[in-house]
Curated annotation (Swiss-Prot):
It catalyses: RNA(n) + a ribonucleoside 5'-triphosphate = RNA(n+1) + diphosphate. It comes from the Bacteria. InterPro entries: DNA-dir_RNA_pol_omega (IPR003716), Pol_omega/Rpo6/RPB6 (IPR006110), RPB6/omega-like_sf (IPR036161). The gene is rpoZ. The RNAP catalytic core consists of 2 alpha, 1 beta, 1 beta' and 1 omega subunit. When a sigma factor is associated with the core the holoenzyme is formed, which can initiate transcription. GO terms for cellular component: DNA-directed RNA polymerase complex. One of its GO terms (molecular function) is DNA-directed RNA polymerase activity. GO terms for biological process: DNA-templated transcription. Keywords: DNA-directed RNA polymerase, Nucleotidyltransferase, Transcription, Transferase. Its EC number is 2.7.7.6. This is DNA-directed RNA polymerase subunit omega. Belongs to the RNA polymerase subunit omega family. It is an enzyme of class 2 (transferase). Signal peptide: none annotated.
Length: 67
């Protein structure tokens, strides 16, 4: 099993605070039933981080957030 680290995700989203928000919102989407963008049997938080590290999810998550 490959380990996912925050450093891998920071290559895609350099700001730690934006990274945290994007991962949180994506994980919430996964919990609500949205389909994962990659095959993963991990928990939603880890899946969200894997998606960010691989470039499948990014800052567009912050644009979807209702204000």
């Amino acid at each position: 099993m490959a380990r996912i680290t925050v450093e891998d995700c920071l290559n895609q989203i350099p700001n730690r605070f934006k990274l945290t928000l994007a991962a949180t919102y994506r994980a919430r989407e996964l919990v609500q039933g949205h389909a994962p963008r990659l095959d993963s049997k991990d928990k939603p938080t880890v899946t969200a981080l894997r998606e960010i590290a691989s470039g499948l999810t990014g800052l567009e998550m912050l644009r979807k957030v209702p204000t």
